[in-house]
């Protein structure tokens, strides 16, 4: 393969060659002529777009809503249909006996940790003059909201795997609705965690999925998937709908806790694009448009721009994981632990059933290499790998990390003697398209210090084309507009990768 070193000033011309608009053809060979046919199509999830179009064009009264199955309601919610506002649903209300969150939480049985947390949540502080008070109970009672957050985190972790309905009953669905609606405007952590937990709950059997689609959650989710206050709200609401539809047999894959579906085309995807962020990044932050001004067009450019500029149906997924510079506890995961976790989740999401393209920033490139080493079948399906400022041979930040407190496993991976790069080199010939993007502007470090986070000699992989981008480390993956040099590289890379994927069909 010929290898090119291309300066960023030459890249803007690439943009116009790949720009096109993709409009899926939603027409049917049969045609829908009556509201009964539209309802039947929605219930069978056949020609759903045409059925929705028929209903919107003919504007029948809402009496047909009672004929829609939970599956049809889920499809409507997933598409953000306004029809969900008119569906009769079960109210998410608490029983008269459940006057507080603590009484509701007491119904769930999640083991000793849960019982201990419940006791702490409901404890009452002793007055100082009460000599019979147990030692350590003179302190003010802990914040109810803080304890509720901790208990909800525990529930989220416990529901990442299948659970016994006897331990977490169906009442968890209205409970999470109440948590979300009560704290949406006052505590983002609690409201987002309620949504994340519901996305796990949706996978635990038809009763939970049906409860979601026939309760107050239905109109709320249909609104959130389109008009959520944040990208996180929109992505998690989409995940809830997809997971519930998987449980009901409509969708043949699952979106586990670390996987987000950024874009899903109307047609069968030709490829899966997997985005992996880097150190201190996140799926809701790393892939946003560069926000140097107040005129922000996109909070997730892969989701908003790529479907407009790539004329092929593609599914776009994002992996999300915590990554830090410094370690204050012993609970952070190593690269191998994360890779093992992601292997299971990618398989559940159906990644590997079709050609795969990876787009990775910084540490995300190392994680992708670990995944491909551990999953030979996934490596065979990989047609493209874009390294964006990935430290293949270490970074000065690792040495800096040793000098402050306790560097994390993530920082230690940036050492030059890390053997991962050498191991991956042995299998990289199997990947037809490999591209490297290199940062060329210094980043702010500490105080007035500046420096290149990932120097050129480390960011350039041994194979494939190389592009130098005039940006700092954390912005090299954030194009400011669709004519940006960095975005042109992405389009060029995707075009080449999709061409390779199409060759495999012949």
Map each language-model feature to its residues:
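Active-site loop/turn elements of alpha/beta-hydrolase fold enzymes
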Residues: 321-323, 390, 439
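Hydrophobic/aromatic beta-strand patches that form the interior of the parallel beta-sheet core
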Residues: 274, 317-319, 384-386, 433-438, ...
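Active-site-adjacent alpha-helix of alpha/beta-hydrolase-fold enzymes
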Residues: 407, 425, 440-472
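Catalytic histidine-centered segment of alpha/beta-hydrolase-like enzymes
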Residues: 328, 473-480
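Post-His helix in hydrolase/transferase enzymes
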Residues: 478-494
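Flexible, membrane-associating and regulatory peripheral segments of lipid-active enzymes
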Residues: 2-305, 311-354
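Serine-dependent carboxylesterase/thioesterase catalytic core
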Residues: 277, 326, 336-429
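Short aromatic-enriched loop/helix-cap "lid" or pocket-rim segments at secondary-structure transitions
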Residues: 285-289, 329-331, 382, 394-401, ...
């Amino acid at each position: 393969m010929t290898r090119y070193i291309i300066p960023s000033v030459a890249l803007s011309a690439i943009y116009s060659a790949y720009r096109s608009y993709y409009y899926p053809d939603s027409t049917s060979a049969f045609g829908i002529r009556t509201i009964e046919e539209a309802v039947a199509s929605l219930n069978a999830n056949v020609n759903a777009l045409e059925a929705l179009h028929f209903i919107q064009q003919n504007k029948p009264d809402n009496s047909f809503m009672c004929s829609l199955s939970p599956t049809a309601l889920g499809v409507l919610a997933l598409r953000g249909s306004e029809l969900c506002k008119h569906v009769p649903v079960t109210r998410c209300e608490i029983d008269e006996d459940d006057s507080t969150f603590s009484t509701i939480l007491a119904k769930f049985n999640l083991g000793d940790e849960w019982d201990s947390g419940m006791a702490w949540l409901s404890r009452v502080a002793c007055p100082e003059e009460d000599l019979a008070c147990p030692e350590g109970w003179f302190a003010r009672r802990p914040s109810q909201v803080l304890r509720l957050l901790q208990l909800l985190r525990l529930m989220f972790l416990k529901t990442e795997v299948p659970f016994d309905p006897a331990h977490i009953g169906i009442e968890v669905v209205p409970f999470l609705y109440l948590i979300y609606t009560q704290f949406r405007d006052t505590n983002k952590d609690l409201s987002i965690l309620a949504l994340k937990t519901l996305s796990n709950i949706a996978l635990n059997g038809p009763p939970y999925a049906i409860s979601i689609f026939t309760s107050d959650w239905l109109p709320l989710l249909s609104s959130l998937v389109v008009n959520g206050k944040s990208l996180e709200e929109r992505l998690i609401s989409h995940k809830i709908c997809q997971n519930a539809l998987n449980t009901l047999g409509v969708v043949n894959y699952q979106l586990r806790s670390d996987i987000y579906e950024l874009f899903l085309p109307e047609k069968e995807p030709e490829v899966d694009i997997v985005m992996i962020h880097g150190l201190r990044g996140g799926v809701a932050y790393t892939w946003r448009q560069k926000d140097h001004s107040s005129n922000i067009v996109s909070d997730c450019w892969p989701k908003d721009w790529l479907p407009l500029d790539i004329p092929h149906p593609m599914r776009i997924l994002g992996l999300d994981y915590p990554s830090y510079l410094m370690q204050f506890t012993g609970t952070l995961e190593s690269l191998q632990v994360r890779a093992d976790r992601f292997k299971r989740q990618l398989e559940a999401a159906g990644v590997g059933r079709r050609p795969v393209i990876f787009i990775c920033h910084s540490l995300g490139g190392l994680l992708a290499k670990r995944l491909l080493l551990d999953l030979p079948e996934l490596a065979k399906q990989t047609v493209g790998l874009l390294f964006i400022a990935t430290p293949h041979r270490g970074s000065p930040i690792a040495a800096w990390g040793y000098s402050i407190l306790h560097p994390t496993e993530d920082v230690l991976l940036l050492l030059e003697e890390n053997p991962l790069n050498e191991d991956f080199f042995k299998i990289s010939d199997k990947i037809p398209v490999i591209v490297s993007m290199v940062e060329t502007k210094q980043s702010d470090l500490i105080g007035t210090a500046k420096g290149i986070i990932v120097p050129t000699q480390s960011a350039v992989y041994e194979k494939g084309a190389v592009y130098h981008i005039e940006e700092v480390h954390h912005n090299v993956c954030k194009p400011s507009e669709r004519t940006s040099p960095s975005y042109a590289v992405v389009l060029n890379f995707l075009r080449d990768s999709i061409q390779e994927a199409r060759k495999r069909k012949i």
